[in-house]
C-alpha cells in the first residue's frame, strides 16, 4: 500500500508544468469543438446523463442555471465543498478514466478561457459543469467564434 499523501506532497516543478501543458491542450481542444458544434448537441462521455443527474442531486444549488453559468472558484475549494466533491468522485472513479486529472474550467459560460475566467479543477468537475451547461444550451453561443 502506498504511503503517498497528495495533501502534503511537494509539487515538483516539472510535473506541474506537464500537467499545465496537458490541461491547456484539453481546454484548447474543447474550445475548438465548441466553435464547431453547439454544446447542446455534444456528449462528453457515455455517462453524461448519469453525471448530470448525480450532479443535480448532490449539488442542488446548481439546479439554478445562473449558478451553473457563472460561479466562483472559491465555492469549489472550501473544506465543505471539497468533501462533497470527494463523495461525488467515488461514484465515477471506476467508470470514468482519468476522472481526477487536472483540467481547466471556465468559471463563466459566457466568456472564453482567460486569466480571470478559468480555474483548475478535477476532470469530473469539468464534466459536471460542462454537461450541465451543454444541456441548458449555455455554450451554444460559441459556435462560429474563433
From Swiss-Prot:
Subcellular localization(s) per the UniProt record: Cytoplasm
Keywords: Cytoplasm
Main location: cytoplasm
GO cellular component labels: cytoplasm
GO terms under biological process: 'de novo' cotranslational protein folding
Alphabetical list of InterPro entries matching this protein: PBDC1-like_dom_sf, PBDC1_metazoa/fungi, Polysacc_synth_dom
Pfam family, one: PBDC1
Keyword Lipid metabolism among UniProt keywords: no
Bilayer-spanning residue ranges: none
GO MF: misfolded protein binding; nascent polypeptide-associated complex binding; protein folding chaperone; ribosome binding; translation elongation factor binding
Any further remark recorded for this protein: Present with 37500 molecules/cell in log phase SD medium.
Listed name of the protein: Protein PBDC1 homolog
Organism encoding this protein: Saccharomyces cerevisiae (strain ATCC 204508 / S288c) (Baker's yeast)
Amino acid at each position: 500500500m502506498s504511503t503517498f499523501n497528495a495533501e502534503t506532497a511537494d509539487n515538483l516543478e516539472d510535473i506541474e508544468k506537464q500537467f499545465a501543458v496537458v490541461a491547456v491542450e484539453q481546454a484548447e481542444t474543447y474550445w475548438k469543438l465548441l466553435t464547431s458544434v453547439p454544446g447542446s448537441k455534444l456528449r462528453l462521455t457515455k455517462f453524461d446523463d448519469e453525471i448530470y443527474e448525480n450532479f443535480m442531486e448532490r449539488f442542488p444549488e446548481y439546479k439554478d442555471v445562473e449558478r451553473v453559468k457563472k460561479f466562483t472558484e472559491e465555492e469549489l475549494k472550501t473544506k465543505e465543498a471539497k468533501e462533497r466533491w470527494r463523495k461525488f468522485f467515488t461514484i465515477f472513479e471506476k467508470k470514468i478514466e482519468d476522472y481526477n486529472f487536472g483540467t481547466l474550467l471556465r468559471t463563466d459560460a459566457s466568456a472564453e478561457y482567460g486569466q480571470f475566467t478559468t480555474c483548475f479543477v478535477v476532470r469530473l468537475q469539468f464534466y459536471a459543469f460542462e454537461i450541465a451547461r451543454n444541456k441548458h444550451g449555455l455554450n451554444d453561443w460559441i459556435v462560429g467564434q474563433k
